[in-house]
């Protein structure tokens, strides 16, 4: 047995499924998950010493690559001061100021420790602000594992939601309405039917958990207009795409201003940190100012804040996002070209440092289109690339990520490996 296999067998005795987050178990693609021992730059190494070009980047945070020397120095500098205080720090103020500067829609911000906490808290705040209960989300958009958000639509637009996870009470699910992503007509119908009941609409402006799917400008414009007309709070979940697709996030790309924004991943620099923020009049309803309670023992943890603040400073370097976008586009265009050479149905898309690979004839715009992907062929491709030392997301329904240290040589090596993988799929 390989060391990865031994560790996986051992892990399953004490950890449900052997992992602490389901996608890591390789259930979607089959085989043994890789247990990572260390990482550096664009690479990581597994328990058997195999090196991989890393295209998940800890599912988004590692925009600078692993163990960036300046981030490492920032963390080491504060370690000797204490790990956690449970009291305010100057660094919390500094990162809040930086976030508000970079994302103009955020007038005030509250730090938390995970994306799930950010979305859960933002929804509670929206409900407290509006005194309404109903929330609207979109099929295929993942907003963390809070009960209200683990809901899928029923058979018709106006039916109550049904939970898609065991353990979610129907009484909670019924307050969530799920609509089709990018469907403006369905959105308008929903607001016409019960717009004055909607506390909030939460959306990923660039979805990453049904692979990469972009919102259309018309869809986001309709969301902004309808939320304004009906007094509903528009929440952009930019936990994944915030600081990934542009310095100001997807809201900068689209020119749409949400009421609240959820952030995570990049703002922790690889440490557990997330945030939610937005309009001052809405944020004023949070305790201790208002009646909406939210708290966290490790919120604003000084070590996580040090890593996050240094990361936010470094990504402001001139040309950073142009370089990141160019390299990501080089990757997806190269993959599409070699797939075409092999006559394998395949499409790819990218925005900033995010990308999507689809074993379909065209780039999808909704969850229904994503599900048409040739999953067995993706799984075969994944393992061919893994054997060649390239680690893509172990699921046909996850976006990938490029860091600033994925240079042209690394991208070209990936494309060369893919040429052989696609050729074998065509055989």
Curated annotation (Swiss-Prot):
PROSITE patterns named in the record: AA_TRANSFER_CLASS_3
| Highest taxon above the source species | Bacteria
Q: Which residues carry this modification: N6-(pyridoxal phosphate)lysine?
A: 265
Q: Describe which pathway this protein belongs to, using the record's wording.
A: Porphyrin-containing compound metabolism; protoporphyrin-IX biosynthesis; 5-aminolevulinate from L-glutamyl-tRNA(Glu): step 2/2
Q: Where in the cell is it found?
A: Cytoplasm
Task: Report which reactions are catalysed by this protein.
Answer: (S)-4-amino-5-oxopentanoate = 5-aminolevulinate
Q: Which family does it belong to?
A: Belongs to the class-III pyridoxal-phosphate-dependent aminotransferase family. HemL subfamily.
This protein is called what? Glutamate-1-semialdehyde 2,1-aminomutase
Q: Which organism is it from?
A: Paraburkholderia phytofirmans (strain DSM 17436 / LMG 22146 / PsJN)
């Amino acid at each position: 047995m390989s060391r990865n296999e031994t560790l996986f067998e051992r892990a399953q005795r004490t950890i449900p499924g052997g992992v602490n987050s389901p996608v890591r178990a390789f259930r979607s693609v089959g085989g043994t998950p890789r247990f990572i021992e260390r990482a550096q730059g664009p690479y990581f190494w597994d328990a058997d010493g195999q090196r991989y070009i890393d295209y998940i980047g800890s599912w988004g945070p590692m925009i600078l690559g692993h163990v960036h020397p300046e981030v490492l120095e920032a963390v080491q500098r504060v370690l000797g001061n204490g790990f956690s205080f449970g009291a305010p720090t100057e660094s919390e103020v500094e990162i809040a100021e930086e976030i508000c500067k970079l994302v103009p829609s955020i007038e005030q911000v509250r730090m938390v420790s995970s994306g799930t906490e950010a979305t859960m808290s933002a929804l509670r705040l929206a409900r407290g602000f509006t005194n309404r209960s109903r929330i609207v989300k979109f099929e295929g958009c993942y907003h963390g594992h809070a009960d209200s958000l683990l809901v899928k639509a029923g058979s018709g637009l106006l039916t109550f939601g049904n939970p898609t996870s065991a353990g979610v009470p129907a009484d909670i699910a019924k307050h969530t309405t799920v609509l089709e992503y990018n469907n403006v007509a369905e959105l308008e119908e929903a607001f016409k039917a019960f717009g004055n009941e909607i506390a909030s609409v939460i959306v990923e402006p660039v979805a990453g958990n049904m692979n990469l799917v972009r919102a259309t400008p018309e869809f986001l414009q309709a969301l902004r207009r309808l939320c304004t007309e009906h007094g509903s709070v528009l929440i952009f979940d930019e936990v994944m795409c915030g600081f990934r697709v542009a310095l100001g996030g997807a809201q900068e790309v689209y020119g749409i201003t949400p009421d609240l924004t959820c952030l995570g991943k990049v703002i922790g620099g690889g440490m557990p940190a997330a945030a939610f923020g937005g309009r001052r009049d809405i944020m004023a309803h949070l305790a201790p100012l208002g009646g909406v309670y939210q708290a966290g023992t490790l919120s604003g943890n000084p070590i996580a804040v040090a890593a996050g603040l240094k990361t936010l400073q470094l990504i402001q370097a001139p040309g950073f996002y142009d370089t990141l976008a160019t390299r990501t586009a080089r990757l997806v265009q190269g993959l599409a070209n070699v797939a075409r050479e092999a006559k394998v149905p395949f499409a790819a898309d990218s925005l900033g440092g995010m990308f999507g690979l689809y074993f379909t004839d065209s780039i999808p715009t909704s969850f229904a289109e994503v599900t048409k992907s040739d999953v067995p062929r993706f799984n075969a491709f994944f393992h061919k690339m893994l054997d060649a030392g390239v680690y893509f997301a172990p699921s046909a329904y996850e976006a990938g990520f490029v860091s600033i240290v994925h240079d042209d040589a690394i991208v070209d090596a990936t494309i060369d490996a893919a040429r052989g993988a696609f050729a074998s799929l065509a055989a």
